[in-house]
Amino acid sequence: MSKIEESVDVQVPVRTAYNQWTQFEDFPQFMEGVKEVKQITDTRLRWRAEIAGVEREWEADITEQRPDERIAWQSLDGPRHAGVVTFHRLEDGVTRVMLQLEWEPGDAVEKIADWTGFVTQRVKDDLRRFTEFIESRGQETGAWRGEVDQDPTR
């Protein structure tokens, strides 16, 4: 499994950054390669994205969600990955968004993309675009404030 950890500081309150991140269907607006995210249920997402030039589809479950703190997920099929995004108040109106990903590169193209740092750079660029997206708006496009308790069997 490959691991990526990146963070970005955004000039919005924790609540605003967190609320925007719960709007999964907006991800294509700032995540390169993400074509579509559909929220099937409160805890299930259907993704369609281009990875290393190949279009892929998969479902992922939200395994834990605590408002203004964290959102964790794990893929169910397709590219094997899991991750967590956490939100940290630095000062009034400034939030650190930290993203941690673990993923299993599949074919040779994905392994090369991982080895060359392409995937890490894409994550950095996505976080930068998230910053531009939320700071230019100044407010979230929506919010889901529900909680998902971590399943102790995972």
Question: Regions from the language model: what does each represent?
Answer:
Residues 52-59, 105-109:
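Short, cysteine-centered beta-strand-loop-beta hairpins and adjacent loop/turn segments enriched
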Residues 39-46, 65-73:
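Short, hydrophobic/aromatic-rich segments at coil-to-beta transitions
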Residues 63-64, 72-132, 136, 141-143, ...:
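Beta-strand/loop substructures that line and gate deep hydrophobic ligand-binding cavities in soluble
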Residues 1-44, 129-138, 149-154:
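Hydrophobic ligand-binding cavity/cleft-lining segments
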Residues 49-53, 75-77:
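Short acidic, glycine-rich loop/turn motifs
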Residues 3-7, 44, 57, 70, ...:
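Intrinsic-disorder/low-complexity, polar/charged segments enriched in Ser/Thr/Lys/Arg/Asp/Glu/Gln
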